Amino acid sequence: MCLAGCTPRKAAAPGRGALPRARLPRTAPAAATMFQPAAKRGFTIESLVAKDGGTGGGTGGGGAGSHLLAAAASEEPLRPTALNYPHPSAAEAAFVSGFPAAAAAGAGRSLYGGPELVFPEAMNHPALTVHPAHQLGASPLQPPHSFFGAQHRDPLHFYPWVLRNRFFGHRFQASDVPQDGLLLHGPFARKPKRIRTAFSPSQLLRLERAFEKNHYVVGAERKQLAGSLSLSETQVKVWFQNRRTKYKRQKLEEEGPESEQKKKGSHHINRWRIATKQANGEDIDVTSND
């Protein structure tokens, strides 16, 4: 009885102690997978669209998704090209040299990847052409030529809607724009001064005679006078306006301050006579001190 009873107990003791050792390796990967912290995702399109590789890989330690997450987490975020260069001239060189190549070949990451946003006229502009010194293999720190140099001052190709909608303040043609005066034409540019009419001596003589007869020439008379002098009615009207202003100024200069004082005194006397209803008998000298 003792030998039969002691043998199973000695055989069962190592069995109970070895049972947990056999189960731990099976449950350890599951527990580690359950409590494994999720990898940080980046802000790139690949990391946002990619699926989580931890759930799909099972107990195999992750799959292709884990590699995508690791690559997305270690990938450098998008930043402007100018921030990668410490010197301003280097940033300008990188912009001028890298923009046309990236836009033409479609290489690199762009915020506006649509092909409809690229204007062919702008890409063919000489200011955006790639300099031979800025091609692949050259140093990006070499400063380029000036963007607004003398060679880039050619007139731009104006679109029809610019010429039609009077965007520049007045209607003009693209051929009228000078080579070096393109920046002077803008919506806030001053209008050119009106050209003064140069009258001939015979025209001035006839205009002066017409002004002596009548200071105001209107209607058919002005039309007839303009036709006889080979002038427009507007030119004749403006000349008469200026001539009347000159006539009034000359008359005031000839009369002087004494005539103005007499006018003021006679004006007060006329108001007094109208108020008292007295007839105009004698002229009162308003300049005397008596």
UniProtKB/Swiss-Prot annotation:
Spell out the molecular function terms from Gene Ontology.
Answer: DNA-binding transcription factor activity, RNA polymerase II-specific; RNA polymerase II cis-regulatory region sequence-specific DNA binding; sequence-specific double-stranded DNA binding
The answer to whether UniProt assigns keyword Cytoplasm to this entry is: yes
The residues that make up the annotated DNA-binding region are 192-251
One Pfam entry for this protein is Homeodomain
Could you tell me the superkingdom of the organism this chain comes from? Eukaryota
Known Gene3D superfamilies for this protein?
Answer: Homeodomain-like (1.10.10.60)
Sorted alphabetically, the keyword list is: Cytoplasm, Developmental protein, DNA-binding, Homeobox, Nucleus
Q: Where is the composition biased (Basic and acidic residues)?
A: 250-263
User: Which residue ranges are recorded for the region named Disordered?
Assistant: 249-290
Record InterPro entries: EMX-VAX-Noto_Homeobox_TFs (IPR050877), HD (IPR001356), HD_metazoa (IPR020479), Homeobox_CS (IPR017970), Homeodomain-like_sf (IPR009057)
User: What are the GO cellular component annotations?
Assistant: chromatin; chromosome; cytoplasm; nucleolus; nucleus
Where found in the cell? Answer: Nucleus; Cytoplasm
- Report the principal subcellular site: nucleus
Disulfide feature: none
The processes (GO biological process) annotated in the record are: brain development; brain morphogenesis; central nervous system development; cerebral cortex neuron differentiation; cerebral cortex regionalization; homeostasis of number of cells; in utero embryonic development; neuroepithelial cell differentiation
Tissue expr: Cerebral cortex.
Reported function? Transcription factor, which in cooperation with EMX2, acts to generate the boundary between the roof and archipallium in the developing brain. May function in combinations with OTX1/2 to specify cell fates in the developing central nervous system.
User: Which family does the record claim for this protein?
Assistant: Belongs to the EMX homeobox family.
- Can you state the subunit structure given in the record? Interacts with WRD11 (via the N-terminal and the central portion of the protein); the interaction associates EMX1 with GLI3.
Listed name of the protein? Homeobox protein EMX1
